Amino acid sequence: MTKEPGIAIIGLGLMGASLAMALRKRGYAGRLAAYARKAETRQEALARGIVDAAHDDPDAAAGEATLVVLCAPIRASVELAADIAPALRPGTVVTDVGSTKGWLCRQMAGILPPGVFVGSHPIAGSEKQGLQAASADLYEGALTVVAAAPAAADAAAARVDALWTAAGSRTCRMAPEDHDRVLARTSHLPHVAAAALAKAIGRDGAAQVGAFCGTGFYDSTRVASGSIEMWNDILATNAPAVAEELRAFKMEVEQVYDDLQAGRFGEVARFLERAREAREELLKGRGRKDGAR
């Protein structure tokens, strides 16, 4: 359990509210302060006992805490860090929940004192958004990557580890650039592929075609319903790595296209077989059975 006497959650959407709920459910006894832009979000968070204090000013929330968690889209997190920097107490650690780390760590180095920021990325979420979609179990058993820049002290990273462990997550350490290369393949490429698939299927007469869409369509395009602001930030701040993964994906699609055009159906069958084997290996690596979410 984290020993932080006070934690500030800057942003009470899906990720931030779920973090507060997870900490409370698992016995965190310290003070939880939060910032949210909308008055109705602040009121609901207080009424449900999700946080102890809900502010309309991020400085006020951050000033109460020894650990601050930025739960906003990546570029908005940079702006929020600049806002709260003057209010931070000595010894306060700042972390985040964003899906890219290299660009963010570089930006934070110009805003916060050395050793204050430790990036983190809980590999959990939903295409749903907002406080209403939050769950105390969102982080349960999920992997959170703690991606500290070289200037970050190990003690600060350990405090971020403890935060996510207290929320029910497993943690691992990675360099920010290594994190971005891996997540470009496992998260960012799948999102672009889902978006492209939804766009291609709905290109003409979407209303008429929709009646014929089954579970395969919904399963393979679900994430395309996610936050546009969040995903635009992710792709913009990890563009080279995502582009490299798209190149590999494009080669696979083009090969199947060529084989279909040429009538090489044996090659198509081998492609499908290799794809199934690859998926099974990926699921083993994550420790999940087929069909598990």
Regions found by a protein language model. Give the residues of each.
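Glycine-rich, N-terminal phosphate-binding loop of Rossmann-like dinucleotide-binding domains
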Residues: C71-P73, G98, A148
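NAD(P)+-binding Rossmann beta1-loop-alpha1 motif at the extreme N-terminus of oxidoreductases
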Residues: M1-G63, L67
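Internal alpha-helical scaffold of NAD(P)-dependent oxidoreductase catalytic cores
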Residues: D137-R222
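Interdomain hinge/lid region at the active-site interface
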Residues: A207-A275
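Rossmann-like NAD(P)-binding element
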Residues: P58-L88, T92-V93
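Residues at the starts of beta-strands that form the adenosine-phosphate
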Residues: G6, R31, V116, L143, ...
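Rossmann-like NAD(P)(H) cofactor-binding subdomain of soluble oxidoreductases
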Residues: L80-A134
